[in-house]
């Protein structure tokens, strides 16, 4: 049963930035829960100290590098990231005495790039290139680390320390917060660490009872890969969402691939309307990937049926995307303005 009102029971004193990571609330989305007859619960990962779910993985991949002797004090953390992992890494770099170098696609919001620079990171926005291309931002990050003394490429996409962060923290938190009543889990994947770690934990803890569905944006290969068992992967299309979707099966997804029960492709039209609906009806200002995840949770609830408890992830807030998602010209450029429901157009206040 969800508690109401402002809560006064809080964790005790924690040690620094890293001590503040995790233990995020699980929010019941009341209007959607009432509409579906299910409990739709969303993990408020935007409450992590760096502002996103990626703080968990950022800490674990740095700790992994330290344990393996790849990184010592004064060294350099190097990563390829769409933004949020980089922000988490930059915070941790400041806290632990490292330099931080980030390579990222030049399609990401300027707010993400600026935030990384504010945190002292060296940022290299590079043209978008597929993973098979040596100019892909991840490969450029790897080469930078290889050519820099005392530098470690943390390899968030294939380093299973990412998966482990969610297997050891996010998954157990969800299980404890729902008192083991969770019936379904769904979220999108970028690296796949959140989806994989939570799926692995909930499957093991429930003896396979908890269903796990991948939520995929247009332009990502996972939906078609799962639906055709890898025979006809298709990544046609594109999405306004940032940091999710994938053109391959990453090293974090591979270990749980056979545990995936189903996949859903979520069109941008539904995600953008959910962005405004959550603001309008729930008072939640979230990023595009979070809104896609909530659409997926609603779809999963309809599939599982009334009375079920479905959990998803609220990856980050909407602040880094505001200049785009409240902009008529941006929405028109993505062919989204005309599909937004009339009652939500009052929020589009930027030219």
From Swiss-Prot:
Keywords: Amino-acid biosynthesis, Cysteine biosynthesis, Mitochondrion, Pyridoxal phosphate, Transferase, Transit peptide. The keyword Nucleotide-binding does not apply. Its cofactor is pyridoxal 5'-phosphate. CDD domains: CBS_like. Coiled coil: none annotated. Its main location: mitochondrion. InterPro entries: Cys_Synth/Cystath_Beta-Synth, P-phosphate_BS, TrpB-like_PALP, TrpB-like_PALP_sf. The keyword Transit peptide applies. It holds the Pfam family PALP. Pathway: Amino-acid biosynthesis; L-cysteine biosynthesis; L-cysteine from L-serine: step 2/2. GO terms for molecular function: cysteine synthase activity; cysteine synthase activity, acting on O-succinyl-L-serine. Disruption phenotype: Causes cysteine auxotrophy. Its EC number is 2.5.1.-, 2.5.1.47. Residues 1-29 form a transit peptide. It catalyses: O-succinyl-L-serine + hydrogen sulfide = L-cysteine + succinate; O-acetyl-L-serine + hydrogen sulfide = L-cysteine + acetate. The modification N6-(pyridoxal phosphate)lysine is found at residue 54. It is an enzyme of class 2 (transferase). PANTHER family: CYSTATHIONINE BETA-SYNTHASE (PTHR10314). Belongs to the cysteine synthase/cystathionine beta-synthase family. This is Cysteine synthase 1. It comes from Schizosaccharomyces pombe (strain 972 / ATCC 24843) (Fission yeast).
């Amino acid at each position: 049963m969800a508690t109401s009102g402002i809560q006064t029971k809080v964790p005790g004193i924690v040690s620094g930035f890293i001590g503040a990571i995790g233990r995020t609330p699980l929010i019941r989305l009341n209007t959607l829960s009432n509409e579906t007859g299910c409990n739709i619960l969303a993990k408020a990962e935007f409450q992590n100290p760096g502002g996103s779910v990626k703080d968990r993985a950022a800490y674990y991949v740095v700790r992994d590098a330290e344990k393996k002797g790849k990184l010592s004090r004064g060294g350099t953390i190097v990563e390829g990231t769409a933004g949020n992992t980089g922000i988490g890494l930059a915070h941790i770099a400041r806290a632990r005495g490292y330099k931080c170098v980030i390579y990222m696609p030049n399609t990401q919001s300027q707010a993400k790039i600026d935030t990384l620079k504010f945190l002292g990171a060296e940022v290299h926005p590079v043209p978008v290139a597929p993973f098979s291309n040596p100019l892909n931002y991840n490969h450029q990050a790897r080469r930078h680390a290889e050519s820099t003394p005392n530098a470690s490429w943390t390899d968030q996409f294939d380093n299973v320390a990412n998966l482990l962060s969610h297997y050891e923290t996010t998954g157990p938190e969800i299980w404890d917060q729902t008192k083991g009543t969770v019936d379904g889990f769904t979220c999108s994947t970028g690296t796949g660490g959140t989806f994989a770690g939570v799926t692995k934990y909930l499957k093991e803890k429930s003896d396979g009872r908890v269903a796990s569905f991948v939520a995929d944006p247009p332009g990502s290969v996972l939906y078609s890969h799962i639906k055709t068992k890898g025979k006809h992967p298709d990544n046609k299309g594109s999405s306004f969402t940032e940091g999710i979707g994938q053109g391959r099966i990453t090293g974090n997804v591979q270990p749980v691939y056979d545990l995936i029960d189903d996949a859903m492709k979520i069109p941008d039209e539904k995600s953008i309307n959910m962005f405004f609906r959550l603001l309008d009806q729930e008072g939640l200002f979230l990023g595009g990937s979070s809104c896609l995840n909530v659409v997926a949770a609603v779809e999963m609830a309809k599939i599982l049926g009334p009375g079920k408890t479905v959990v998803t992830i609220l990856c980050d807030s909407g602040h880094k995307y505001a200049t785009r998602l409240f902009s008529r010209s941006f929405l028109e450029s993505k062919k989204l303005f005309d599909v937004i429901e009339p009652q939500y157009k009052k929020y589009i206040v930027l030219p």
